[in-house]
Design a protein with these regions (language model features):
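Eukaryotic intrinsically disordered, low-complexity regulatory linkers and tails enriched in Ser/Thr/Pro
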Residues: 1-102, 109-188
Length: 188
């Protein structure tokens, strides 16, 4: 499937990576979805990430700053696009590198070390991809995203100091982020 428009990341997206043509030249990006469809897009991976951040209400730099504020992670930080559904993405490389790939942590089943500084990532739908990233580096990035997920969840649960009732409905004002974070854990 080919899309001419700037793509916005949505529920079910597992991977956003650079695409290559028959001559091995960069040709936009490829989005791999949970339902096993692959969408080709003419825009670069970073452009899709930046546009998706704006679509969900913040800039890419704002999302990075949010991660840093909550976790202290400043190098290759994971981002949460929206708390409405699982969109915790982490990069394989610096966002300034053309070979950077973004992975959704919620769909990863396993990461296996291969020879020559490569990894095999297997997803929960049994698809897999080979990445030119060392196991140590990818595992570190994956754990950073898990830590970020934990800190956001912990923050939303502990606001009222009651994990069973994380939102205090008796307060004069309700923080929308608290409510969205709490209900983002529901599946359809």
């Amino acid at each position: 499937m080919y899309s001419q428009n700037i793509y916005v990341i949505r529920k079910g997206d597992m991977v956003i990576r650079p695409a290559f043509d028959d001559d091995d030249q960069r040709n936009g990006s490829e989005i791999i979805r949970f339902d096993k469809t692959r969408i080709q897009n003419p825009f670069k991976v970073q452009k899709i990430i930046e546009r998706s951040c704006k679509f969900y209400g913040n800039t890419y730099l704002g999302k990075k700053a949010e991660t840093n504020r909550i976790t202290g992670i400043s190098s290759k930080p994971p981002i949460l696009l929206t708390p409405l559904f699982p969109t915790y993405f982490f990069p394989t490389h610096s966002d300034r590198q053309n070979e950077n790939i973004w992975l959704n942590m919620h769909y990863i089943e396993s990461i296996k070390e291969l020879k020559n500084r490569k990894c095999k990532v297997t997803f929960i739908n049994n698809e897999s991809i080979i990445l030119h990233v060392s196991y140590h580096s990818l595992w570190h990035q994956y754990n950073n995203s898990i830590f970020y997920y934990y800190m956001v969840d912990k923050q939303s649960r502990m606001i009222s100091k009651n994990p069973d009732q994380p939102i205090d409905y008796n307060k004069a004002t309700l923080n929308v982020f608290e409510a969205l974070t709490r209900y983002s854990l529901f599946e359809d």
